[in-house]
């Protein structure tokens, strides 16, 4: 061990073969043997040399720790350990072949402050053995427990003793220390405590003498405990759902669980289903053979169940458990062999036990989680009348199915929270379906809309409709989805629809157009009076054909729209309009298949396919080339856009109320009021995105988008003809009225341009609606205006542009006929927009347009009776002009369209909001190739619209080139709702409205008698339509 010779008598000297000191051999061997036994280790500490042992003599047998430490100190000196406490190191390098005693057994490095254990005297580094003792107070070498450590040994009487604290003494040898074991680990103590009669009686049974359910069944100790099952059911039903949230059944005392399980066995209540989320385990015998570890989870459950069955008979529990665990790997749990082995023990409870055992074995849960997710089905065995509710432990939504069989009412009551159960399973009748559908719809969109007042009656009314019943059949076998109203936040996709103009969507667009039309109609019928009433009533009253199909589709759609509207629209509704409200809700149409019904409606009613959306689509491509034909055919593509813009509302209403008679002035007016409100709302909803609300919140250039509802045009042509008196705005959009007219249909072609114009159109129309609503004392005027102002952002932008062009508002008529026809017709019903956008209103008229636009928007209804009452006191005349632009184009390409006779309707609206509709129908067949010059009609009250493309005079005069006026028609006092008219509303600020109603190829000249003249230099709009002239007075 280095160059320095080890001291004589040291262990190393002996190992190197040096002669030991002279001592009595026998005594030395005896003492060393004692030390060896004491160390009980092959590598005993060589602290005591033979010489030391000899010197100690007989004192060794009673060696004390002090003596040992003294000898150890001597040995340290001989081994050249440093005398410094805590830093003693071997001063010389330990050779590679040094004895294991020369290194610390724990760190396998040189000793650092050599220390000795009090019992075995094994040497370790003090720090190493100290840390070791914190974990286990056992010698790492001999595994003997120790209580103290001797360290810092300098001399026999100079050392330190480190006494272990009791906390560190946690070795297995200490009987006071209890080792951690899993609850499923069976130890003697546990087996004794679990199966001893005393412990079993105290812990596992209800009462000390409990003998188990089996023995109760045999009559040994029968206790009628079935009476308690309702109480247990209620208790567990209350605990079950809460445990899934926060609590666990562990908090429920074992006794309660045992009692509950015992009660279930007594009553024969079995687990019906497990809320396992579709997960399950393999329980085949082969699986258990391959995976014996999976058997462990079965043990706790088996012990509990067998304890429930056998009670205090612990021996039976052990025997049956052993049999079960042995057979699980032999037979399948469902096999007859497995059951037959248990029948001698379980007797009449065998099937029940096997059912419960298989349910638990299949489930992916442990015992506690299984109890939480288990659904129990109580048979009607006891006197439990209340068990229908309490018998089934509702712990999971799956139990709804369980309860379904027990009680329909309870299942229906659970419908709101049970999402997994389909609607039809809840309802047993139509009304129930309706209620459930309303609940489902309300959950999908907003409960408020469907639950709002009158919704239930509306839903029922809709059910009465055949179309609604058809929808219910189509949507689901039993459930009628009356309305599907999505939140406003989820309705933005309509913008996307507006942008999409492809003709490929023809039928789809048509459907969407119908939806949008109805939606817009509901809003353009704003108060949902027009849209709803006109769809179910006015359509029925005016066009029974259209009303039939339309009412059907409207009814379905109205159910949705009306539901939404019932909440959204404060405006008063007629009972029929109330139905229509749902129908008219544009969002409902969009989201519902009601749009399809409307599209079918539109298809049936508009043979030419004037669907505004389709017309828009075709209008884009063909409007430039085929104005008249695009009016018809492109009404489909446009219709889609119109739908997007809620123009389809008007068009659908127009086609529905094509025969709608303006004579029903008050009805139309109330409708227009309500439709104004609805329009504005729908527009505000649909066009919030389009309207730029600028600083013109106060200053709206009212523009009336005229819904010319021409029966010939199927109401699709009833497009919003927004006439902006401020021609400058339109000028920038399109210099010529023809272009504007085209732009309506071209909007499909020029999406960008159409989009901006559309925005402006929406804005102006919105403003005009708001203005008209302000002026028209319609019940919906207030909310409508609010709605109009809602999208005011874009509208403001548009208005700013309008104001920039013209601050002064020219007569509302000029503005309306010009601006709306040109720009908004394009946006609403491009096909219908053909001619009227020729003239623009002055700046003043544009300002008024803004106002009228809001009103217009509000008044936008199926029979676009602009309840524009100029001033509240003034009698405003609603002039409805058919969209000649679309007709004009369509006429160019289709002469047959011109064959339809134009209808002119003059509407007088009192300050009360009632407008008398006077329509003079004068049909003269003759071609009038008479172009109308700019400013041909400068009369404030007279607006002439011709189908030919007209050029808007910048002085707000409309020049229309008459291509061929084969027919001129003047409609006077047309009260019958059956009169097919495409209504374009020309509104004046002075509450003067001119409406031109013309067939697809008819020219309408509207002369409005204002309650007071409009202070506009020119209010004449001339448009030329091939083959027909319509003069309206």
Curated annotation (Swiss-Prot):
Polar residues compositional bias, start-end: 455-464, 731-747, 992-1008
Compositional bias annotation for Low complexity: 434-444, 465-477, 522-535, 654-669, 770-780
Annotated segments matching region Required for DNA-binding: 52-376
Glycyl lysine isopeptide (Lys-Gly) (interchain with G-Cter in SUMO2) crosslink residues: 74, 77, 84, 89, 160, 251, 701, 818, 834
Induction per the UniProt record: By genotoxic agents such as cisplatin and camptothecin.
One GO cellular component term noted in the UniProt record for this chain: gamma-tubulin complex
Reactions catalysed according to its record: S-ubiquitinyl-[E2 ubiquitin-conjugating enzyme]-L-cysteine + [acceptor protein]-L-lysine = [E2 ubiquitin-conjugating enzyme]-L-cysteine + N(6)-ubiquitinyl-[acceptor protein]-L-lysine
Post-translational modification as stated in the protein's UniProt record: Phosphorylation at Ser-99 regulates the E3 ubiquitin-protein ligase activity but not the SUMO1-protein ligase activity. Phosphorylation at Ser-718 increases the E3 ubiquitin-protein ligase activity versus the E3 SUMO1-protein ligase activity resulting in increased p53/TP53 ubiquitination and degradation. Sumoylated.
Region (Disordered): 1-36, 414-477, 496-692, 713-934, 970-1033
Location of the protein in the cell: Nucleus; Nucleus, PML body
Zinc finger (RING-type): 104-143
GO process terms (BP): DNA damage response; intrinsic apoptotic signaling pathway in response to DNA damage; intrinsic apoptotic signaling pathway in response to DNA damage by p53 class mediator; maintenance of protein location in nucleus; positive regulation of DNA-templated transcription; proteasome-mediated ubiquitin-dependent protein catabolic process; protein K48-linked ubiquitination; protein localization to nucleus
Subunit relationships: Interacts with TOP1. Interacts with the SUMO1 conjugating enzyme UBE2I. Interacts with SUMO1. Interacts with NKX3-1; polyubiquitinates NKX3-1 and induces its proteasomal degradation. Interacts with SIN3A; sumoylates SIN3A. Interacts with IKBKE; induced by DNA damage. Interacts with p53/TP53. Interacts with PARK7/DJ-1.
Protein name: E3 ubiquitin-protein ligase Topors
Organism: Mus musculus (Mouse)
């Amino acid at each position: 061990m280095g160059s320095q010779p080890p001291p004589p008598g040291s262990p190393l000297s002996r190992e190197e073969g040096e002669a030991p000191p002279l001592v009595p051999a026998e005594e030395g061997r005896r003492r060393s043997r004692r030390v060896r036994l004491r160390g009980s280790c092959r590598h005993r500490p060589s602290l005591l040399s033979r010489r030391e042992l000899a010197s100690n003599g007989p004192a060794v047998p009673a060696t004390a720790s002090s003596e040992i430490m003294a000898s150890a100190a001597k040995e340290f000196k001989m081994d050249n350990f440093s005398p410094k406490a805590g830093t003693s190191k071997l001063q010389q390098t330990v050779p590679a072949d040094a004895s294991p005693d020369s290194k610390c057994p724990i760190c396998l490095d040189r000793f650092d402050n050599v220390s000795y254990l009090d019992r075995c005297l094994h040497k370790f580094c003090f720090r190493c053995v100290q840390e070791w003792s914190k974990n286990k107070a056992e010698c790492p070498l001999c595994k003997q427990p120790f209580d103290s450590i001797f360290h810092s040994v300098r001399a026999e009487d100079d050392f330190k003793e480190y006494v272990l604290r009791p906390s560190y003494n946690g070795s297995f040898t200490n009987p006071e220390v209890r080792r951690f074991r899993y609850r499923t680990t069976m130890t003697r103590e546990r087996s004794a405590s679990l199966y001893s009669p005393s412990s079993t009686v105290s812990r596992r049974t209800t009462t000390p003498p409990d003998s188990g359910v089996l023995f109760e069944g045999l009559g040994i100790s029968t206790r009628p405990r079935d009476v308690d099952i309702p109480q247990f059911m209620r208790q567990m039903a209350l605990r079950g759902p809460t445990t899934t949230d926060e609590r666990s059944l562990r908090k429920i005392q074992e006794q309660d669980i045992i009692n509950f399980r015992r009660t279930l066995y007594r009553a024969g209540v079995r687990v019906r289903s497990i809320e396992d989320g579709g997960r399950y385990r393999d329980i085949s015998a082969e699986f258990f053979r391959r995976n014996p570890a999976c058997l462990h989870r079965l043990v706790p459950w088996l012990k509990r169940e067998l304890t429930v069955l056998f009670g205090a008979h612990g021996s039976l529990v052990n025997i049956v458990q052993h049999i079960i665990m042995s057979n699980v790997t032999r037979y399948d749990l469902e096999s007859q062999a497995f059951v037959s082995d248990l029948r001698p023990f379980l007797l009449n409870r065998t099937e029940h036990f096997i059912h419960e055992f298989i349910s638990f074995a299949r489930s992916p849960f442990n015992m506690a989680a299984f109890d939480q997710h288990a659904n129990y089905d109580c048979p009607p065995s006891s006197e439990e009348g209340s068990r229908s509710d309490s018998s089934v432990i509702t712990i999971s939504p799956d139990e709804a199915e369980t309860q379904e069989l027990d009680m329909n009412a309870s299942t229906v009551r659970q419908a709101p929270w049970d999402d997994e159960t389909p609607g039809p399973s809840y309802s047993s009748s139509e009304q129930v379906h309706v209620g459930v559908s309303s609940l489902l719809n309300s959950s999908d969109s907003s409960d408020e809309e469907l639950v709002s007042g009158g919704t239930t009656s509306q839903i029922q009314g809709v059910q009465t409709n055949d179309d609604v019943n058809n929808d219910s059949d189509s949507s689901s076998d039993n459930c009628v989805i009356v309305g599907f109203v999505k939140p406003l936040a989820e309705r933005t996709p309509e913008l996307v629809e507006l942008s999409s103009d492809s003709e490929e969507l023809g039928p789809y667009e048509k459907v969407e157009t119908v939806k949008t039309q109805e939606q817009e109609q509901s809003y353009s019928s704003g108060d949902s009076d027009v849209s709803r009433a006109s769809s179910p009533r006015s359509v029925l009253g005016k066009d029974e054909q259209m009303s039939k199909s339309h009412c059907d589709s409207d009814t379905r759609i109205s159910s949705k729209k009306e539901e939404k509207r019932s909440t959204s629209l404060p405006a008063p509704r007629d009972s029929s309009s109330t139905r229509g409200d749902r129908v008219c809700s544009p969002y409902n149409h969009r989201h519902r298949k009601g749009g399809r019904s409307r599209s079918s409606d539109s298809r049936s009613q508009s043979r030419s396919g004037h669907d505004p959306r389709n017309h828009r689509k075709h209008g884009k491509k063909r409007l430039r080339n085929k104005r008249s034909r695009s009016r018809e055919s492109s009404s489909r593509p446009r219709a889609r856009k119109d739908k997007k813009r809620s123009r389809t509302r008007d068009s659908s209403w127009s086609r529905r109320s094509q025969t709608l008679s303006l004579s029903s002035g008050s009805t139309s007016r109330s409708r227009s009021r309500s439709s104004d409100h609805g329009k504005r709302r729908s527009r505000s909803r649909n066009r919030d995105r389009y309207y730029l609300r600028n600083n013109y919140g106060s200053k709206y250039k009212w523009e009336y988008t005229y819904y010319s509802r021409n029966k010939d045009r199927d109401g699709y042509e009833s497009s919003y003809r927004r006439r902006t008196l401020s021609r400058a705005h339109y000028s920038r959009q399109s210099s010529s009225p023809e272009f504007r007219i085209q732009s309506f249909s071209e909007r499909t072609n020029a999406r960008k341009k159409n989009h901006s114009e559309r925005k402006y159109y929406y804005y102006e129309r919105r403003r005009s609606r708001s203005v008209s609503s302000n002026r028209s004392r319609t019940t919906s005027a207030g909310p409508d205006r609010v709605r109009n102002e809602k999208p005011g952002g874009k509208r403001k932008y548009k208005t700013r542009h309008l104001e920039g062009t013209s601050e002064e508002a020219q007569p509302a008529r000029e503005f309306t006929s010009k601006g709306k026809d040109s720009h908004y017709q394009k946006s609403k019903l491009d096909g219908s927009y053909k001619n009227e956008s020729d003239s623009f209103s002055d700046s003043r008229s544009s300002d008024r347009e803004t106002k009228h636009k809001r009103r217009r928007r509000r008044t936008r209804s199926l029979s676009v009776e602009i309840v524009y009452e100029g001033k509240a006191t003034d009698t405003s005349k609603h002039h409805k002009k058919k969209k000649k632009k679309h007709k004009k184009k369509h006429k160019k390409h289709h002469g047959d369209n011109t064959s339809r006779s134009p209808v002119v309707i003059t509407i007088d609206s009192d300050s009360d909001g009632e407008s008398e509709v006077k329509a003079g129908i004068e049909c003269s067949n003759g071609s009038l190739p008479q172009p109308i010059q700019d400013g041909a009609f400068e009369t404030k009250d007279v607006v002439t619209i011709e189908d030919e493309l007209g050029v808007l005079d910048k002085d707000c005069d409309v020049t229309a080139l008459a291509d061929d006026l084969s027919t001129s028609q003047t409609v006077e006092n047309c009260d019958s709702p059956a009169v097919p008219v495409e209504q374009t509303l020309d509104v004046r600020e002075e509450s003067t409205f001119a409406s031109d109603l013309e067939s697809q190829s008819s020219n309408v000249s509207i002369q409005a008698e204002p309650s007071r003249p409009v202070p506009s230099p020119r209010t004449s709009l001339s448009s030329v339509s091939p083959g027909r002239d319509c003069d309206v007075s």
